[in-house]
């Protein structure tokens, strides 16, 4: 189920405050956040936000196609290591 329209999108208050301060000062610095559930707003476009994936902060440059999605969608928590390829020489 999607979120109710009357509630509006969820954005962590500190993340929103930091992006608004960067917009006012016209500076471009990386914002670190653990809030993967925050929705990307149009005021965040053009900024780089480092989202925590459980191990490190992954820097994500926000573009206008990302508006409306959540930050956690772009910082993957699992890394797939490919399965070992079986060599024909080893089989024999």
Curated annotation (Swiss-Prot):
One of its GO terms (biological process) is translation. SUPFAM superfamilies: Ribosomal protein S19. InterPro entries: Ribosomal_uS19, Ribosomal_uS19_bac-type, Ribosomal_uS19_CS, Ribosomal_uS19_SF. GO terms for cellular component: chloroplast; mitochondrial small ribosomal subunit. Keywords: Chloroplast, Plastid, Ribonucleoprotein, Ribosomal protein, RNA-binding, rRNA-binding. It comes from the Eukaryota. PROSITE patterns: RIBOSOMAL_S19. It is found in: Plastid, Chloroplast. GO terms for molecular function: rRNA binding; structural constituent of ribosome. Protein S19 forms a complex with S13 that binds strongly to the 16S ribosomal RNA. Belongs to the universal ribosomal protein uS19 family. PANTHER family: RIBOSOMAL PROTEIN S19P FAMILY MEMBER, SMALL RIBOSOMAL SUBUNIT PROTEIN US19M. NCBIfam families: rpsS_bact. This is Small ribosomal subunit protein uS19c.
